[in-house]
């Protein structure tokens, strides 16, 4: 990880980061929160992350010179975590009967009543934040807002999620998903109104949540999630990488990286690749990640008879993750629910053409005809055609790669961290000018 120098005009701060999802969970929110904590610490700020415990019990851990307060949690069994592969189906009656996958024992951890433990840590460790940064609109986030309001601490809220990310995996709620999604959209908007400053990864995400963002009571700005451009670079993976994962070095690879869950519409991508294979039998689809939909997708691949052309690689981290991006001929996501999509940033930084869905914020990274193609949601033929155009035209792929490397320069993680430093400084100074209690408010009114 590249550590940027601290800006001379920014004072050192005590920063509380509250996230109901944090490492070792693997998704966009946890990755961003981890990057934020690491980079702010590297610039000299004191950072404490408040997140659900991975064991269920309260504890505090030191991670790369910052602390993570693990708040007492309970298992949310209807949604799997992304720290490991899915558990094997449970079998009974001597292995003759497979128990339906009604729920998964390694689900998300939820901290339902975290406020007392937040107070406890801050009191025992003499930690009073200068600013609180909320990453998700759930229990830990709301508790940190309540704590901050009580102690007159400014609050910054970043909204990373689309409603579909939360509920489209729960098939039992599928008939109600339109109503639920609208309700959640309203909830996330009202949640953000508790902030002194709100951010979202892209302008499109802001416009989806706020009809007139400029009229909101607090500033609302687009700040990219950013990625470390010193880590994700357009190099060829070493020979050892291909051998380790038994990947072909000279065949076209269609790459998909991320959560393998229903709202990512990976089944659409598989069906599109099935069409591509009718004219390009050497194409390979490589799916990196795990999630609730993997068993269904593996079954779909088997039924289509394309198991030799589709590889499920499971969750990959570190340099292996970077090399999977580098090994791709083209990166493709059929997901219509991205607020930005860190994987699009990573792929573009590795010099890969990208294909996405023309919905929401993806178009800021995947620019149609510039560094890739945008397709209609679940349009299998259009996605297949877009993949084939890139696989069949090396010059087009090279042009898209070059253009993508220019686009990605705007999303350097250093710029993102500097922007949040400025935002923190702004809300801290603004909070100092506000009356602390009703007596100060009354006094100021009387002086007018």
Regions found by a protein language model. Give the residues of each.
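Conserved acidic donor-binding segment of nucleotide-sugar-dependent glycosyltransferases
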Residues: 368-369, 373-380, 389-395, 409
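Short alpha-helical donor nucleotide-sugar binding micro-motif in glycosyltransferases
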Residues: 192, 315-316, 323-328
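Nucleotide-activated donor-binding/catalytic signature segment of Leloir-type glycosyltransferases, i.e.
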Residues: 296-316
């Amino acid at each position: 990880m590249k550590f940027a120098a601290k800006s001379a005009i920014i004072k050192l701060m005590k920063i509380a980061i509250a996230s109901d999802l944090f490492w070792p969970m693997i998704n966009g929110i946890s990755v961003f929160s981890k990057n934020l904590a690491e980079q702010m610490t590297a610039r000299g700020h004191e950072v404490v992350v408040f997140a659900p415990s991975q064991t269920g019990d309260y504890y505090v851990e030191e991670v790369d010179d910052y602390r993570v307060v693990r708040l007492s949690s309970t298992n949310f069994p209807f949604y799997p975590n992304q720290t490991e592969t899915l558990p094997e189906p449970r079998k009974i009656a001597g292995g003759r009967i497979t128990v339906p996958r009604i729920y998964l024992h390694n689900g998300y951890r939820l901290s339902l009543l975290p406020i007392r433990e937040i107070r406890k840590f801050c009191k025992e460790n003499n930690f009073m934040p200068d600013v609180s940064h909320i990453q998700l609109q759930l229990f830990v986030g709301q508790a940190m807002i309540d704590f901050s309001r009580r102690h007159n601490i400014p609050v910054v809220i970043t909204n990373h999620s689309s409603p579909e990310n939360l509920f489209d995996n729960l098939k039992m709620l599928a008939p109600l998903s339109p109503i639920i999604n609208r309700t959640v959209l309203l909830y996330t908007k009202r949640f953000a109104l508790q902030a002194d400053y709100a951010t979202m990864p892209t302008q499109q995400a802001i416009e989806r949540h706020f009809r007139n963002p400029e009229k909101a009571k607090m500033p609302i700005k687009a700040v990219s999630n950013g990625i470390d451009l010193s880590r994700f670079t357009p190099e060829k993976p070493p020979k050892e990488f291909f051998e380790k994962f038994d990947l072909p070095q000279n065949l076209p690879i269609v790459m998909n990286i991320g959560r393998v869950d229903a709202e990512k519409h990976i089944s659409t991508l598989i069906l599109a690749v099935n069409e591509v294979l009718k004219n390009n039998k050497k194409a390979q689809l490589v799916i990196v990640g795990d999630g609730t939909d993997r068993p269904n997708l593996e079954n779909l691949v088997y039924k289509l008879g394309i198991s030799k052309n589709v590889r499920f690689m499971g969750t990959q981290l570190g340099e292996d993750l970077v090399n999977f991006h580098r090994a791709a001929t083209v990166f493709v996501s059929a997901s219509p629910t991205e607020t930005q999509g860190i994987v699009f940033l990573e792929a573009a930084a590795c010099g890969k053409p990208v294909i996405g869905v023309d919905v929401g914020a993806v178009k800021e990274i995947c620019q149609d005809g510039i560094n890739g193609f945008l397709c209609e949601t679940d349009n299998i033929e259009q996605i297949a055609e877009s993949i084939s155009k890139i696989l069949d035209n090396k010059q087009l792929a090279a042009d898209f790669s070059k253009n993508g490397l220019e686009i990605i320069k705007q999303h350097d993680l250093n710029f993102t961290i500097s922007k949040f430093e400025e935002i923190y400084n702004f809300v801290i100074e603004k909070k100092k000018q506000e009356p602390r209690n009703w007596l100060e408010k009354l006094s100021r009114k009387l002086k007018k």
